[in-house]
Structure formats: structure tokens, C-alpha cells
Amino acid sequence: MAALLITATDTEVGKTVLTTSLTAYWQTYRGKKGLGLMKLLQTGVGDQERYHQLFGADSSIEIKVPLWFKTPVAPPVAAAAEGKTIDLKRVWQEFCALQQRQSFVLLEALGGLGSPVTEELTVADIAGQWRLETVLVVPVKLGAIAQAVANVALARQHQIKLKGIILNCSQPISEEQLKDWTPINLIQSLTSTPVLGILPYISDLNDLEKLTQAASTLDLEKLLPL
């Protein structure tokens, strides 16, 4: 499957930073090949708007957000509040069609791996059932080790094809804090999952050059078809 699902341990911990960094890298170095950029499902304002702000003018990048709810809460709660249903069949069909049209698809999940998509299914269920190659974003902070262990265990429970972990610095941190909060060897030992890189703190998330540079520090051979 020519796609990568980007999920995380929680909401607001770096999925969109990784997604836009990989997209910026693709735009810079693989621009002749089409890329699909898709949000699994969106509630409230956010990712769809950022995608269009950063990449909307590039015809080689096709942006898709099949389902959107105005209420910025968990999808089943938002759907109930708005009197709507969550049509995952539509999402799957648009995802498959996007793969047919483009060389590769970056699919950004919502919330964390355990976040509900419907009243019955979580992101982990979707990743497992759709057999998506997946990367897990873990924030660099106190408690990150436990979050990584718990989420990798959840991924294994759902037989997810987890390619690795990306550590994300959402704020400026010291080398000492990085080593203390997210010791790579310990995380890899406890999870039996490779850490594919560390996204540095990016002061301007609208700077495509900085996003590209951030992506270039990662183990891209495991993330993109280079």
C-alpha cells in the first residue's frame, strides 16, 4: 500500500507537524510525482485549513478531507450534536481513489491512537482493519516513555503495521531534557520499535524551508518511497 498513516499518543502532540514536514520535503525533492494529503476525519477548524494554506497552490499535491464536523470534539460526539452520521465507507473510498491517482498518500489521523472515530471504532481499529503502514508521534515531555509503551502495546493488540516512532519537540528543550524525558535506547528496548528520528522545535510552522529541513533529519527511507 502506497500510503502512510500518521498517528500519535494524544491530540496536539505533533501529527500535523510531521505531516506537513513530510509534505514539504516531498514538494521540494519529489515534486514531479503527485502526492495525496488526506485527513482521516476532521472536527472543528485546523488541519484542513493548514494544508490549504501551505500547499493549496501546488497542483501536484491533492488535498482531501472527506468528512468534517463543525463541533471541535470527538467525532461521535460531534456527529451526534450535529445530527449527522460518520460514513467510513466514504472515507475508505476516497482514500482508495486518492491512492489510484497519486504516487503516495499521507493520511493524518485524529487525536491519539486510542481516540474514537465512531461509537464502535478507534483510530487503532481503523489502522488495523485497513492494514495501514503507520508511524507514531510521541511528544518529548515527562511521561513520554509510558505513553510510547502504552500506544505501541495498543498497536500490537490491533496488529497494526507500525513502522516506527517519531519524537516531536513542541517547545524548545535542552539536550539534557531530551535525554532524560525520551531516552531513545530505553524507548526502543521497552517497545521493540525503532525511533525513526526527532522533529526539532520549529518556531515558524508556516516556513516550508524549516519544515523541509526538519523532515530531512528523519529516517525517510522508512517513511517515504524515495
Curated annotation (Swiss-Prot):
Residue positions of the active site: 39
Xref: InterPro entries: DTB_synth_BioD, P-loop_NTPase
CDD domains found in the cross-reference section: DTBS
Pfam families to which the protein is assigned, alphabetical: AAA_26
Catalyses which reaction(s): (7R,8S)-7,8-diammoniononanoate + CO2 + ATP = (4R,5S)-dethiobiotin + ADP + phosphate + 3 H(+); (7R,8S)-8-amino-7-(carboxyamino)nonanoate + ATP = (4R,5S)-dethiobiotin + ADP + phosphate + H(+)
Residues reported to bind ATP: 12-17, 47, 108-111, 168-169, 200-202
Described function: Catalyzes a mechanistically unusual reaction, the ATP-dependent insertion of CO2 between the N7 and N8 nitrogen atoms of 7,8-diaminopelargonic acid (DAPA, also called 7,8-diammoniononanoate) to form a ureido ring. This cyanobacterium does not encode bioA (which catalyzes the formation of the precursor for this reaction in the cannonical pathway), instead it encodes bioU, which replaces bioA and also performs the first half of the cannonical BioD reaction. Thus in this organism BioD has a different substrate.
Descriptive protein name: ATP-dependent dethiobiotin synthetase BioD
Native source species: Gloeothece citriformis (strain PCC 7424) (Cyanothece sp. (strain PCC 7424))
Gene designation per UniProt: bioD
